[in-house]
């Protein structure tokens, strides 16, 4: 690796760093050493989830990629060096010694305002960093190239370049370009960045030295599974046979029960025919009895009808005599006259009572109206009150005079009715006005509530066109310019001049401003959309030209009382108010060309004009304007709601009076018609008394005698008529009963025919071979002396019992069939009446050759054992032996170096946990031709069987531990000297930091050496805070070992270790930081030949 270029990375704006074969990076704490190392992490590891920034800081590190990209400062005034949108580049240059050419790798990161990141990785062959441009020029200004433009340019300049958005694809391409490195490179590279104690040597070896080797056991498992399947199939055949035999037995029981039920059904049908014949005989006897009873009732009815007719004639005779009597006629006439007169007199009395009561109510209503106080919407006139007083007195007079009145009262009531009609009309008009006012108030209330809600959300109530234009510009300009509404960016210094400022600026408070260089663009957008969005009337300030007004303010001007949030806004205020002078009073206005008083009297072009209150009463300027608007709006809302309540009360009150006064004029005309009611009542009473006197003088003795005779014959007629009715009713009942019995007899005869037919059809419905037995059972049943009904009940109970047994057995049969179908995937019909399908299945199983099955099972087990010995054992033994050879090579290289008096060696030995399996795997006596079950050593044979069972039983992946050859080994690192041998596992718990760091670096270097077995690789090792706990001698020995292994070193080291490493390093880079900018100094440079390519050293001979 020759160079690293950092653009917009933390505090590096654009820095190129040169590397030699042995490079150390130093600087004060916080200067930015780890920043360089973390840039290499982003470049090599690429997957952000796998990167631990500033990893040498252990758990205290809390850096993130976005903090590096933006350059986190951490102060409230300025949290980051870079804000908004920008692009970062991290680029490295490598020299391929074998090919004799350079290549470049890198990453570009677009960072957006919301911290969203877009990454693109690139690998450029046959190129150098100085051949690539990362900047572009616009308007004589130098800008970092955007990602899209950069990638487009790279594709054109270097057609063979690899550009990837996927970190995974980039990682694969990068490892291939680095010499076909194993993917373990990423973990080893990250682990080397800081000292981390190796608490598990086996885990370290797995990740950094020994590769996983997939050992296929599929064939062995498949053979064993075939054996298991055959074994299961044999067991299944036996189970099937047993299940089918059970189904067959149950079916035979069902057939027996079905035959019993069939015979019982034959007997029951015969008994049912005998019973229906008995019922027919009973119906015929009942018909004879009903016909006899009907004849007697008809004879009695005829005789009673003759007696009733004689009584009716006598009754008619006496009715004629009474009707022709003169006394009867006069008596009836007088009674009818008296009854009619009483009725009409009663009606008049009722009308009079209602009339008098209405007069009292009317007097009360008129008195209430006369006392009505009125309000601003309605009040009574003096004339109206005078008319009401006269009308009230008239009503009171009539009420106390029993409703009787004359011409004067008639005239008074007519005038009162006309007055009340006019008053009611006025109430109607006032109510309409109030309802219109109520609607206006509700509209105002709704608007105020909306404004208050917006203000509480800190949203000023601007005209819709202002908000639309602001939103439109923000959408199109995005990060190119901010968009302001003037009033939001202003603050008033002295509240005394608030009204003058609000009123003088008026709608200019809502003018929209953009940054000067974007005004022309904003104006084009405004012009394009002004009619589509209804934007007319909104002010868009030419901020570019207005900058000339900044600072041009006359002393004593209104501009002194207001301040803008930025120079663009301030220029606007200086333009609008810089020449408007503050006047103490209205007379002082004339001293100036343009002026205004604190009371909002303006003076301009020789015209004085008071600014309307509605213009300035709602404040918009400044941070406190929203709160002031909110207070004003809430106060207005209270006033409107109070007025709404008052108006609502008035409407309700007026409608009450409208209802009271409705139809008064018509009512009063009816009252006038009732003035003569008393005279009419007196006339009726006089006539009633006269007719009663005449009625009392009539002689009615002869008439009473005739009436007595009529009464006697009437009683006899009623008696005969009742008897005749009773007889008619009895005749109807007898006929109805006779009809019912005849219908029942018809049904019985029909039923008897059907039952007989059903009995005969039995032989077609059931098995014909049962007929003879059924006929015998029938004869036995009817030969007893018991009633047919009792016999039938007995047979029904027996049949029901057999049916229940049959249903139970049938259900059990179907359950067994269903279970068999589900368990054996059989397509038999569960509800089938016969058992043919299951009988056929049973027959097939009975014909199978079971011994042949057993022989096949034995042979497949032997095949699985042979595969286990010939493949698995041999391959596992070979993998373990290869691992030992690999560690021998590493130990051969490590044996050439001493740390003081110490030499290091990897120790590999059988795993304690899996030792029994290890021993049998490595036992040369285990050969493919020897069966597991015929092995001479019984203990070893049992272990082999155990291992075999673990591998073939269970799902794939359950016993992966026995397939990985590394699990059969344990690993350690020994430290050897004249005093003996110690092991790293013990050293980590006992020794000092330097003594524990040395094994760490030995192990890490061994890991890299293993990764770089192929000569043509990058051979790069990077350490952060390297060797910080080692003494000088250990550091120098470690550096020499790195050289001897032909590794390129880049190490960030503490200041105090710099002197110890200078003798062995060929390049020293010092990181400096001033404020929030970092740069590098190179104190010693690589030799001229190293600038072309790193020197080759004959270290591979030690390993090969």
Curated annotation (Swiss-Prot):
<dbReference type="Pfam" id="PF13558">
    <property type="entry name" value="SbcC_Walker_B"/>
</dbReference>
<dbReference type="GO" id="GO:0006302">
    <property type="term" value="P:double-strand break repair"/>
</dbReference>
<dbReference type="Pfam" id="PF13555">
    <property type="entry name" value="AAA_29"/>
</dbReference>
<protein>
    <recommendedName>
        <fullName>Wadjet protein JetC</fullName>
    </recommendedName>
</protein>
<dbReference type="GO" id="GO:0000731">
    <property type="term" value="P:DNA synthesis involved in DNA repair"/>
</dbReference>
<dbReference type="InterPro" id="IPR027417">
    <property type="entry name" value="P-loop_NTPase"/>
</dbReference>
<comment type="function">
    <text>Component of antiplasmid transformation system Wadjet type I, composed of JetA, JetB, JetC and JetD. Expression of Wadjet type I in B.subtilis (strain BEST7003) reduces the transformation efficiency of plasmid pHCMC05. May be an ATPase.</text>
</comment>
């Amino acid at each position: 690796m020759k160079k690293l270029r950092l653009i917009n990375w933390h505090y590096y704006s654009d820095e190129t760093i040169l590397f030699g074969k042995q490079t150390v990076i130093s600087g004060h704490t916080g200067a930015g050493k780890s920043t360089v190392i973390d840039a290499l992490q982003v470049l090599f590891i690429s997957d952000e989830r796998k990167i631990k920034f500033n990893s040498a800081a252990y758990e205290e590190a809390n850096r993130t990629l976005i903090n590096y990209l933006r350059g986190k400062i951490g102060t409230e005034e300025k949290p980051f060096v870079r804000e908004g949108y920008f692009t970062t580049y991290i680029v490295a240059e490598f020299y391929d010694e074998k090919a004799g050419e350079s290549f470049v790798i890198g990453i570009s990161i677009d960072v957006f305002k919301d911290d969203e990141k877009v990454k693109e990785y690139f690998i450029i062959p046959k190129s150098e960093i100085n051949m690539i441009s990362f900047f572009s020029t616009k308007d004589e200004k130098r800008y970092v190239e955007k990602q899209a433009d950069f990638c487009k340019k790279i594709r054109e300049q270097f057609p063979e370049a690899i550009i990837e958005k996927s970190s995974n694809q980039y990682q694969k391409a990068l490892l291939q370009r680095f010499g076909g490195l194993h993917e373990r490179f990423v973990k080893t590279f990250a682990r080397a960045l800081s000292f981390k104690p190796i608490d598990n040597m086996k885990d370290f070896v797995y990740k950094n030295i020994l590769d996983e080797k997939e050992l296929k056991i599929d064939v062995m498992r498949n053979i064993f599974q075939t054996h298991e399947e055959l074994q299961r199939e044999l067991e299944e055949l036996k189970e099937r046979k047993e299940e089918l035999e059970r189904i067959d037995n149950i079916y035979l029981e069902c057939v027996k029960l079905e035959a019993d039920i069939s015979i019982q059904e034959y007997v029951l049908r015969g008994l049912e025919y005998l019973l229906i014949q008995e019922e027919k005989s009973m119906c015929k006897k009942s018909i004879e009895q009903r016909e006899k009873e009907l004849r007697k009732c008809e004879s009695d009815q005829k005789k009673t009808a003759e007696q009733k007719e004689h009584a009716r004639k006598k009754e008619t005779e006496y009715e004629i005599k009474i009707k022709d009597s003169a006394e009867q006629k006069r008596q009836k006439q007088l009674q009818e006259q008296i009854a009619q007169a009483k009725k009409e007199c009663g009606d008049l009395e009722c009308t009079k009572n209602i009339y008098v009561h209405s007069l009292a109510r009317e007097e009360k209503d008129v008195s209430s109206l006369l006392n009505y106080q009125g309000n601003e919407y309605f009040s009574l006139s003096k004339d109206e009150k005078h008319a009401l007083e006269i009308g009230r007195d008239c009503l009171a007079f009539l009420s106390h005079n029993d409703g009787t009145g004359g011409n004067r009262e008639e005239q008074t009531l007519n005038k009162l009715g006309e007055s009340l009609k006019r008053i009611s009309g006025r109430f109607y008009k006032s109510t309409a006005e109030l309802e219109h006012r109520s609607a206006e108030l509700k509209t105002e209330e709704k608007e105020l509530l909306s404004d208050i809600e917006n203000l509480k959300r800190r949203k000023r109530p601007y005209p819709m066109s202002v908000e639309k234009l602001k939103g439109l510009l923000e959408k199109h300009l995005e990060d190119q310019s901010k968009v302001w509404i003037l009033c939001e960016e202003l603050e008033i210094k002295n509240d005394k001049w608030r009204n003058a400022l609000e009123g003088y600026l008026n709608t200019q408070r809502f003018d929209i401003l953009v940054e000067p260089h974007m005004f022309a663009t904003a104006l084009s957008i405004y012009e394009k959309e002004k009619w589509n969005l209804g934007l007319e009337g909104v002010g868009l300030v030419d901020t570019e030209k207005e900058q000339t007004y900044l600072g041009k303010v006359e002393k004593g001007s209104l501009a002194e009382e207001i301040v803008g949030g930025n120079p663009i806004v301030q220029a606007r205020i200086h333009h609008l108010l810089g020449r408007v002078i503050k006047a103490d009073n209205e007379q002082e206005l004339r001293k100036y060309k343009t002026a205004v008083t604190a009371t909002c009297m303006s003076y301009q072009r020789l015209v004085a004009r008071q600014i309307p209150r509605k213009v300035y009463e709602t404040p918009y300027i400044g941070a406190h304007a929203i709160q002031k608007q909110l207070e004003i709006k809430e106060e207005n809302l209270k006033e409107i709601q109070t007025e709404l309540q008052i108006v609502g009360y008035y409407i309700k009150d007026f409608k009450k009076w409208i209802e009271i006064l409705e139809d008064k004029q018509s009512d009063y005309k009816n009252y006038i018609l009732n003035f003569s009611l008393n005279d009419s009542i007196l006339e009726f009473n006089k006539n009633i008394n006269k007719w009663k006197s005449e009625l009392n003088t009539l002689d009615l003795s002869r008439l009473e005698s005739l009436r007595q005779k009529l009464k006697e014959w009437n009683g006899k007629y009623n008696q005969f008529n009742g008897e005749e009715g009773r007889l008619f009713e009895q005749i109807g009942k007898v006929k109805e009963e006779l009809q019912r019995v005849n219908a029942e007899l018809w049904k019985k005869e029909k039923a008897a025919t059907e039952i007989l037919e059903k009995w005969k059809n039995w032989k077609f419905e059931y098995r014909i071979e049962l007929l003879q037995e059924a006929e015998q059972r029938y004869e036995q049943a009817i030969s007893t002396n018991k009633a047919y009904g009792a016999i039938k009940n007995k047979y029904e109970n027996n049949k029901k019992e057999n049916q229940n047994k049959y249903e139970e057995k049938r259900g059990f049969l179907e359950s067994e069939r269903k279970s068999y179908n589900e368990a054996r995937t059989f397509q038999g019909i569960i509800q089938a009446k016969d058992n043919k399908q299951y009988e056929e299945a049973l027959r097939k199983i009975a014909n199978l050759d079971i011994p042949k099955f057993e022989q096949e099972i034995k042979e497949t087990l032997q095949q699985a054992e042979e595969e286990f010995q010939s493949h698995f054992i041999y391959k596992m033994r070979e993998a373990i032996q290869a691992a030992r050879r690999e560690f021998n090579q590493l130990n051969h290289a490590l044996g050439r170096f001493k740390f003081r008096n110490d030499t290091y060696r990897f120790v590999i030995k059988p795993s304690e946990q899996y030792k029994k399996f290890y021993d049998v795997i490595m036992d040369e006596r285990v050969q493919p031709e020897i069966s597991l079950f015929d092995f001479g050593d019984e203990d070893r044979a049992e272990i082999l069987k155990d291992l075999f069972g673990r591998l073939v039983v269970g799902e794939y992946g359950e016993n992966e531990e026995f397939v990985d050859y590394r699990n059969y080994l344990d690993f350690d690192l020994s430290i050897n000297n004249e005093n003996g041998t110690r092991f790293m596992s013990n050293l980590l718990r006992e020794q000092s930091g330097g003594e524990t760091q040395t094994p760490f670096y030995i192990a890490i270097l061994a890991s890299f050496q293993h990764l770089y077995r192929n000569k043509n690789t990058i051979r790069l090792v990077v350490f952060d805070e390297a060797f910080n706990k080692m003494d000088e001698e250990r550091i120098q020995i470690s550096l020499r070992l790195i050289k001897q292994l032909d590794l390129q070193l880049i190490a960030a080291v503490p200041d105090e270790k710099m002197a110890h490493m200078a003798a062995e390093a060929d390049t020293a880079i010092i990181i400096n930081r001033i404020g929030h900018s970092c740069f590098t100094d190179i104190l010693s440079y690589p030799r001229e030949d190293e600038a072309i390519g790193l020197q080759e050293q004959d270290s591979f001979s030690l390993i090969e």
